[in-house]
Amino acid sequence: MASIEEIAHQIIEQQMGEIVTEQPTGQKIQIVTALDHNTQGKQFILTNHDGSTPNKVILARQDSTPGKVFFTTPDAAGVNQLFFTTPDLSTQQLQFLTDNSSSEQGPNKVFDLCVVCGDKASGRHYGEVTCEGCKGFFKRSIRKNLVYSCRGSKDCIINKHHRNRCQYCRLQRCIAFGMKQDSVQCERKPIEVSREKSSNCAASTEKIYIRKDLRSPLAATPTFVTDSETARSAGLLDSGMFVNIHQSGIKTESTMLMTPDKAVSCQGDLSTLASVVTSLANLGKTKDPAPNSNEVSMIESLSNGDTSYTSVCEFHQEMQTNGDVSRAFDTLAKALNPGESTACQSSGEGMEGNVHLIAGDSSINYIEKEGPLLSDSHVAFRLTMPSPMPEYLNVHYIGESASRLLFLSMHWALSIPSFQALGQENSISLVKAYWNELFTLGLAQCWQVMNVATILATFVNCLHSSLQQDKISAERRKLLMEHIFKLQEFCNSMVKLCIDGYEYAYLKAIVLFSPDHPGLENMEQIEKFQEKAYVEFQDYITKTYPDDTYRLSRLLLRLPALRLMNATITEELFFKGLIGNVRIDSVIPHILKMEPADYNSQIIGHSI
């Protein structure tokens, strides 16, 4: 690669003089030339073709071909012709061309350079001028929330030829040069031409519909929240979150937000709560209670002749007590895994060599785990959405997506040796106490994959429709709306922080090992695990983000907001339309007793 000094010698041979370069000072680059070594050289400054002085021009790259020097402006607008002239802008000029050897990139054509790698740019992508390669790399990394690691010292050279060697440094360079992650969040799948476009619809390029009558050939009627009750509701409209939906039936007070579509058969698929509860319908049937006339009419109006939904509602009424749920899930576990032990092992079982009991000053035995609390295997959080995606978004699809996230969170907790070492009773108590916090963190982590923004906007639309139809009280709607806005604000704040997989794993561990829930046993041991998670978390951030002094504080300050999320409302929004009045608390012990192989083959897939 030719250096400035080599170019200078070439110019001397061409009798153009000697170039002596100085470091950029202020807003200009100074170049001194001298045709004769015995005479004083003239001073030249960089200027535009029209004689005006540019703000700043920097060396973009040096081509391997001798004699080529490429300059560009900081905004990558591209500089094709560079003129060196005297400060008084006299007619004496020394002209350099960026590339005069190519017919495609001649002096009359301006081309942009990628701000990340220096390759030829194809346009402005996500806020900066980049090439197609860096554009696609950045989009994949942000959409899938990929976690990279650097094998070097996190200062790898990123250029056209070496940009694929270190993905970590390449992504950090994309962010450092101003590529906006929020721009990636706004992209959606293209709208089908056959679908009706509404001028009221926001800028989202993906329309998801909810239909009440499966047999209706009509397209969904667009409805939007126009109530000025809160400014935040209008803010959702401005952000392009709302979608076209059909007016949906809603239960009063107990509030089923959307009428269910006909569910795809899920027999034999134990990946979601829907399939588990459906299987229990044949295992845990008791006497058929006679519903009152109001409930029957409401079920008929919601189901619109959908017999599968009617049977699910009947099953919901059959399982009113936790005892029924427990017996049904126990029966299911035995039927699925005869003679096999459950996934949740007793304290210390299978942990030889990793976990040791230490007797303290008192009679309490403390568990000390060798090595880190979390390993690299706990960073990956892979979620597969239900497939195929229905043409019309319905309660079953939302519920199954949420239940897959719930199962995946349970599986993640079970994979931590320290969690299993606490014993089955403590493990169940911890998950029952903090499943809502873990689920909410999962929503933020899977924000893009689950399309959470659209789901929340759908909830808001349905609540607005139900209020207009007098199917829900204003007080109840306000309570649900406040919860939705809390979810929205929390997830948005997490997305803006650009949290990686390691940070999400440690945040979940700190939440999971919280000793302040009443009824927990061995709280001192749980607190020790939480302290260990915090120390490892602090060490990771210090090494990974040495220049971000307050990053740890910002992340930890997001955790108190999780305690403001009402678990009952979360159940109502995401799960009630799928499993009715069966509480998540009653389901958790049976999920933890199931072998992970019975459900994780369906919920584990694409990396988040």
Swiss-Prot record:
Cross-referenced SMART domains, in alphabetical order? HOLI, ZnF_C4
Per its record, what are the GO molecular function terms? nuclear receptor activity; RNA polymerase II cis-regulatory region sequence-specific DNA binding; zinc ion binding
Spans annotated as Required for interaction with NRIP1 = 589-608
Q: Which domain of life is it from?
A: Eukaryota
Q: What are the residue boundaries of the NR LBD domain, all occurrences included?
A: 353-595
Please list the residues that carry the modification Phosphoserine.
Answer: S198, S216, S586
* Residue ranges: DNA binding: 111-186
Q: Where are the zinc fingers (NR C4-type)?
A: 114-134, 150-169
Q: Which family does it belong to?
A: Belongs to the nuclear hormone receptor family. NR2 subfamily.
Q: Please describe the quaternary structure of this protein.
A: Homodimer. Heterodimer; with NR2C2 which is required for chromatin remodeling and for binding to promoter regions such as globin DR1 repeats. Interacts with ESR1; the interaction prevents homodimerization of ESR1 and suppresses its transcriptional activity and cell growth. Interacts with NRIP1 (via its LXXLL motifs); the interaction provides corepressor activity. Interacts with HDAC3 (via the DNA-binding domain); the interaction recruits phosphorylated NR2C1 to PML bodies for sumoylation. Interacts with HDAC4 (via the DNA-binding domain).
According to UniProt, the name of this protein is: Nuclear receptor subfamily 2 group C member 1
